[in-house]
């Protein structure tokens, strides 16, 4: 018997990624000051983080984390069901449920883990089905595959497509899952229409609102609140503590029955050490600031509008997004990487997003905005984007003889 050599396979795949301009590297951040990062001794203005409200370095949140670490240590020491569920976890779950208008919340270490937990615990039969938007986050897609149920995907934002998939699978339990705000496109799911489809087809509606929480809706309560949907219309949702709230972790919110079922049966919850109490304390403080500081959302929206207006004025090919995620279409991987490198030379960090994260031929620069950015930084970035685009176009133009 001759098995495939895994090392040879890895080397072959690496060569392919190099040829396709799809290798990935990590950048080491030496220091951070708001939206400014020091990398290799140089300071760059970043337009690529998810710190939408500018809370990651907020002094009140840092103080809450330090105080909780001094009292409780740096780790929970066990899973929630053993002896890792601290009073601060309980307080955070209560605050989340009260803020978002759900009966209960359940904490997880990350949004990826939470999505795995939800589908593994609820979609337990082979003929169960999860219907998803084609551009959903990878964790939602992987969760369905790992759960062992059927996965059906509909064209992006296509409500009729979602209904069609559910109608064609009448047997088995069903879930309709979607991102609230799509992380690579920045657009918002048609939640009201999708929730109606879910109820009509007797499917459980599940919304991953990782990028909506804190950013949109009344008091920053996210996409579901912005669409004026109730718990009955969206029985289950996920929020993260790591984007607009600036920390780490996630939570799933739903009815007491659903949440208790997850706590008792979801393997990624049962067999994982609880979120560090200090992180929970930081998240609790971040939520209170996010609820209090409406000016952060107002400021963020003003910057989004300014970026879009300036980009249109310079003829930049921005996508249709009214959120802090503002992708700029570049087409092929080589062009996208070249534009990212050109921006870095001008003092900006904007990541190139390439397949398989986005579809073939749709590589882009994913510009993300923070309430901490200044109007000058926005304007200067747009000018740099236009210059890099024009420079690349000049290089690609045929030479006249």
From Swiss-Prot:
Q: Is the keyword Transferase in the record? A: yes
Binding of substrate occurs at 24, 137, 357
Alphabetized UniProt keyword annotations: Biotin biosynthesis, Pyridoxal phosphate, Transferase
- Entries under PROSITE patterns matching the protein: AA_TRANSFER_CLASS_2
Binding residues for pyridoxal 5'-phosphate, per the UniProt record?
111-112, 183, 211, 240
GO BP: any one term: biotin biosynthetic process
Q: Which GO terms describe its molecular function?
A: 8-amino-7-oxononanoate synthase activity; pyridoxal phosphate binding
The enzyme's first-digit EC class, named in words, is transferase
Modified residue annotations for N6-(pyridoxal phosphate)lysine: 243
Q: Which cofactor does it need?
A: pyridoxal 5'-phosphate
Pathway(s) this gene product operates in, as recorded in its UniProt entry: Cofactor biosynthesis; biotin biosynthesis
Q: Which reaction does it catalyse?
A: 6-carboxyhexanoyl-[ACP] + L-alanine + H(+) = (8S)-8-amino-7-oxononanoate + holo-[ACP] + CO2
| InterPro entries the record matches | Aminotrans_II_pyridoxalP_BS (IPR001917), Aminotransferase_I/II_large (IPR004839), AON_synthase_class-II (IPR050087), AONS_Archaea/Proteobacteria (IPR004723), AONS_Proteobacteria (IPR022834), PyrdxlP-dep_Trfase (IPR015424), PyrdxlP-dep_Trfase_major (IPR015421), PyrdxlP-dep_Trfase_small (IPR015422)
Q: Is Acyltransferase one of the keywords UniProt gives this record?
A: no
What this chain does, per the entry, is described as: Catalyzes the decarboxylative condensation of pimeloyl-[acyl-carrier protein] and L-alanine to produce 8-amino-7-oxononanoate (AON), [acyl-carrier protein], and carbon dioxide.
Subunit description: Homodimer.
Designated name of the protein: 8-amino-7-oxononanoate synthase
- Name of the gene encoding the protein in the UniProt record: bioF
């Amino acid at each position: 018997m001759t098995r495939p050599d895994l090392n040879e396979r890895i080397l072959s795949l690496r060569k392919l990624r190099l040829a396709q301009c799809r290798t990935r590297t990590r950048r080491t951040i030496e220091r951070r000051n708001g939206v400014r990062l020091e990398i290799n001794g140089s300071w760059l203005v970043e337009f690529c983080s998810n710190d939408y409200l500018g809370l990651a370095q907020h002094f009140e949140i840092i103080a809450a984390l330090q105080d909780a670490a001094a009292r409780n240590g740096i780790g929970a020491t066990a899973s929630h069901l053993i002896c890792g569920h601290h009073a601060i976890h309980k307080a955070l779950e209560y605050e989340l449920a009260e803020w978002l208008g759900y009966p209960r919340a359940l904490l997880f270490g990350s949004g990826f883990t939470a999505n795995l937990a939800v589908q593994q615990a609820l979609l337990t039969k082979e003929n169960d089905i999860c219907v998803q938007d084609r551009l959903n986050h990878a964790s939602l897609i992987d969760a369905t595959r790992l759960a062992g149920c059927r996965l059906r995907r509909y064209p992006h934002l296509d409500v009729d497509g979602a209904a069609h998939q559910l109608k064609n699978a009448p047997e088995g339990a069903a879930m309709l899952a979607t991102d609230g705000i799509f992380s690579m496109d920045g657009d918002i799911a048609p939640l009201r229409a999708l929730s109606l489809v879910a109820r009509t087809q007797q499917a459980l509606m599940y919304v991953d609102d990782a990028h909506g929480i804190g950013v949109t809706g009344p008091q920053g309560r996210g996409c579901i609140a912005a669409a004026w949907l109730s718990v009955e219309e969206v029985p289950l949702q996920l929020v993260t503590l790591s984007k607009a709230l600036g920390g780490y972790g996630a939570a799933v919110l739903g009815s007491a029955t659903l949440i208790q079922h997850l706590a008792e049966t979801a393997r990624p919850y049962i067999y994982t050490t609880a979120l560090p109490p200090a992180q929970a304390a930081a998240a609790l403080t971040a939520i209170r600031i996010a609820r209090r500081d409406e000016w952060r959302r107002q400021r963020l929206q003003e910057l989004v509008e300014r970026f879009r207006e300036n980009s249109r004025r310079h003829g930049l090919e921005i996508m249709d997004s009214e959120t802090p995620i503002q992708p700029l279409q570049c087409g092929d991987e080589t062009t996208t990487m070249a534009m990212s490198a050109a921006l870095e030379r001008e003092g900006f960090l904007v990541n190139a997003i390439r397949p398989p994260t986005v579809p073939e031929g749709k590589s882009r620069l994913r510009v993300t905005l923070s309430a901490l950015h200044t109007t000058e930084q926005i304007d200067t970035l747009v000018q740099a984007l236009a210059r890099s685009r024009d420079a690349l176009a000049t290089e690609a133009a045929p030479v006249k003889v």
